[in-house]
Amino acid sequence: MKSTVASALLVLAGTAVQAQSGPWQQCGGIGWQGPFTCVSGHTCQVLNDWYHQCVPGGGPSPPPTSPPPTTPPPTSPPPTSPPPTSPPPTSPPPTSPPPTSPPPTSPPPTSPPPTSPPPTSPPPSSGSCPSTPGGLGSGNQRLPDPFTFHNGNTVTSAADFQCRQREVSSLIQQYELGQFPAPPQSVTSSYSGNTLSITVSDQGRSISFSVSISGGSGSKSPAIIAYGAPSIPVPNGVATIRFNNDDIAAQQSGSSRGQGKFYNLYGSGHSAGAMTAWAWGVARIIDALEKTPAAGIDPTRVGVTGCSRNGKGAMVAGALEPRIALTIPQESGSGGSACWRISNWQGQQGQNVQTPAQIITENVWLGPVFNNHANNVNALPFDHHQLAGLIAPRALYVIENSDMEWLGWTATYGCMAAARTQWEALGALDNFGFSQVGGNQHCSFNSGKQSAELNAFINKFLLQSGGGTTSILRTERNHGSFNLAEWTPWNVPNLR
């Protein structure tokens, strides 16, 4: 009997020891019911109100508070209890045949690694670009062709593709994201004590905000702008710029519309959704870095990252701000790396996935104009493979989770596989990566499976030291009856 009791006490003691979150795991946030402390050598930091994460550095931190929500929690929060370390898929494996065109697990680069700095895709000039017809045009149940203009003309050159990018950007802003403002009249900045202070003035109004800068080395270090805080490991030699995107545009709930410093400057009725406002904030950070050498950052080697809701924002920032050298959206799902049409298709298959009709009820990430189109996205002349395509040929590394049904595991894979054709057309496949793996919590970076990929992208496009494969199209999920070829009925031109 004593032996049994002793064994039970040992089990309980072991359980208590384990009641801490591990590296890159969740450790707090609204609705969180798991451990609030981190294992030794990690600190619980706040990414946003909904998600706190254990990151390397420091000793165990005190338990962060988890305030009760003042509004109903969203329908896509991080897990409310810690999942197993290697969770099975949340739906039974598909019984249909495997895809007719399975993705390569990690295809080799189709061209040699670049020996010069990566392309930067400057904003296309409007001088010789065709005018865009008004209206939505004809609907399309499949993904719209990124190589055909809205007027039906075909893209036949790299210059044409820049015009097409300009057209797509305009259409996405008009029908989904809201207007991305032109550069403001004035941006001033100063740097002191690892804080970059920024003041923006436009049309008689001014706002100020600041970001913190840590890490890096030398007077012109590359940097990654992290929405909230980084949920990926940032290597030595690369600075981290922590951007409080909620300060620029609030994202507490559907009642947050028009709140934040962006709207103080441009008015609460501005058409921009929160993600567009955040992208504007990123642009102003880069303005400030260009004006403030004392910050020690090379503004031509800046990346952007975020996870979940902030990952959606990172994708939009990369699409709207051409000075970003590397975009790393992590588990962004619907509104980010997923295509609306494929998310709807998944829902029609009985899967629990975030759809466009649902996302507009959850938050204010998109412009209010999207409320008019969320129930009929087949009428839109674009989808998110083209949002991603606004980044081409700049570098994009998309991190997704093959175990999370809500993110749209097929919608993200299919959408980014379609997006990849734009890098292919430009001869820039080495600048595109999509990696969808499982066995980790939401927003918990899977170091065992993705560190080499992440490091290869950072080395090549920020540190500019080369090394590693950066042409990646990888998924660990069987996508069943999904047939990529049926969703991408276009030929890929040679625009090199």
From Swiss-Prot:
**Classification via InterPro entries:** AB_hydrolase_fold, CBD_sf, Cellulose-bd_dom_fun, GCE-like_dom
Q: Which UniProt keywords apply?
A: Disulfide bond, Hydrolase, Lignin degradation, Secreted, Serine esterase, Signal
Please list which residues make up the signal peptide.
Answer: 1-19
- Which residue numbers delimit the CBM1 domain? 20-55
**Positions contributing to substrate binding:** K312, Q354, E362, W406
Amino acid composition bias (Pro residues), ranges on this chain: 59-125
Q: Where is the active site?
A: S308 (nucleophile), H442 (proton donor/acceptor)
Pfam family name, one: CBM_1
Q: Which reaction does it catalyse?
A: a 4-O-methyl-alpha-D-glucuronosyl ester derivative + H2O = 4-O-methyl-alpha-D-glucuronate derivative + an alcohol + H(+)
Q: Name one GO molecular function term.
A: carboxylic ester hydrolase activity
PROSITE patterns with a match to the protein in the record: CBM1_1 (PS00562), CBM1_2 (PS51164)
State the name under which the record lists this protein. 4-O-methyl-glucuronoyl methylesterase 1
